[in-house]
Every structure is written in C-alpha cells, then in structure tokens.
A protein has these predicted regions:
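Serine-esterase "nucleophile elbow" of acetyl-processing enzymes
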Residues: 39-107, 114-124
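N-terminal secretory targeting modules
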Residues: 1-69, 246-255
Length: 255
C-alpha cells in the first residue's frame, strides 16, 4: 500500500514542499497499529537537490545502512529508459521484496575503479546487487575488466564473507535479445568475452562467499523490453529485470 505524490522544483530556488495524507489514508494507517510508515523521496536523474530542513509531526527515524542493499551499476541501474523513477528496476525490486536499496549506480561510469570498489566495500550493507560490464566494455578489454572484477569480489568476500552478492548478467540479456531479433551488436564479440569472465570469476569466488549470478537470458527476451536506443531497458524491461532478480532473491531467502 503506497501513495505517490509529485512536486515540481524550480532550478536555483528554495522550495517548501508539503506532503500530507488524506483523512482516509490516515485512518487506514491508524488501523495498522504501530507499523512504521516509510517516506521515500525519489530525485530526478542528473539533478542536484539539497534538503535544508524536514519538519514532521512525528519523529522520523533514518534507515540504517545495514538494512539496505547496495546497488552498483550503469545508467540502466539508475533507471534510464523507465518512464519515471518509480518504474525503474531498482524501485520495483524494493516494492517486490519489501527491502531498501541504496542506489550507487554511475551513468556511463561503472568502471570498477579500485577507489570506488574500496568505498562500496566500506559501506555497512545488508548485501550487494551488481550490474556490470555495460560501461566497461567501451573503454577496456576483457582482461582489464576481469582484473577489476577479481579485485572487487576478492575484497567483498574477504571483508563481508557472510554478505550476499547478487550479480545481474545484463550483457547476456542484451545479447540474447539481439540474437533473437537479428540485431547486429557492435560489442557482440566483446560481450562474449566479458560474459565468460563474469562466469569464471563467480565460480572462483562462489566457494568463498555467497555469490548469486542471475542469468540475463531469463530476465528479458523480447525487443519491446528495450527502449529506442536498443541499450537501455524500456519500462517493460525494467519490470522484467526486477521480476527476474526478485525470483532469485526469494528462492535463496535474500530478502
């Protein structure tokens, strides 16, 4: 049960926004007893917004880091291609599994740099969801990608041996759709090598940590799952990705 409100914020202006529930909604919440109410603010991509003050009738408790999954990936994980933030696979995943996700995706810059990996490893997280390869394939070969992924998995499994790591094989999903629809991909040969490296390293570290590789071929298969650029998922694609990840996480009790 959730309510959605939209507010327009002018650039360079300080705005005061009031969020208020209808009387019927308040009565419903009171009927639930002491169950907590979660307020989630979704900001537009590529926009900087600062909170100066939050005034509430009741005390607001911030979620602890260890209650959240950390999501790291490309613009796909940031929600590009979805109609709005609430339609992105990250948000759908939260709703499907009733979990909190801290989105650390970097549009065009998910390159697994050691400094970024070190930062992610320092976060006190419940688990990690990783969507890797889309950005890296454009600026490095599979050997360098494997080197960086090896460092990442080694660090996470060493520092967080009991922390689940879910890897979304998004390149496999894209290549599967291209193949079924006779689309020539400029990264076809490179994708095969990257996918092979991901599978190899998952197998290597699966004996040490709790790593779950989600097959891209089971996420989305039809062309309407992609947007017009044939790279970012469409709204339907985001829904399918969230559904595929949800099934795996439910199967292994990761939520």
């Amino acid at each position: 049960n959730f309510s959605v409100g939209i507010a327009n914020i002018r650039k360079g202006k300080i705005e005061r926004i009031r969020f208020e529930l209808h009387k019927r909604q308040m009565e419903y919440l009171h009927s639930l007893g002491d169950k907590p109410v979660l307020w989630r603010f979704i900001m537009p991509s590529y926009t900087r917004i600062s909170f100066y003050e939050i005034v509430a009738q009741n005390k607001l408790n911030k979620l602890c880091d260890n209650e959240s999954y950390i999501l790291y990936g490309s613009s796909i994980s940031q929600g590009v291609g979805a109609l709005n933030g609430a339609s992105s696979y990250a948000f759908c995943l939260q709703e499907n599994l009733h979990i909190s996700i801290l989105n650390k995706a970097l549009s065009g810059a998910c390159l697994l740099e050691p400094d970024v990996v070190n930062y992610l490893a320092c976060l006190n997280a419940k688990g990690y969801i990783l969507e890797l390869g889309c950005n890296a394939r454009g600026v490095m070969d599979d050997i360098e990608f494997a080197k960086r992924l090896d460092y990442m998995l080694d660090l996470l499994t060493t520092l967080k041996p009991n922390c689940p790591i879910v890897i979304v094989n998004i390149l496999e999903m894209l290549e599967n759709i291209y193949k079924k629809n006779s689309i020539v991909s400029e990264f076809a040969q490179k994708d095969v090598l990257f996918i092979k490296q991901i599978k190899r390293l998952v197998k290597k570290y699966n004996e040490i940590g709790h790593i779950y590789l989600i097959s891209g071929s089971k996420l989305a298969t039809t062309l309407d799952c992609l947007s017009q650029d044939l790279l970012h998922p469409s709204n339907k694609g985001h829904e399918m990705i969230a559904l595929g990840i949800s099934k795996v996480m439910k199967k292994y009790n990761l939520c």
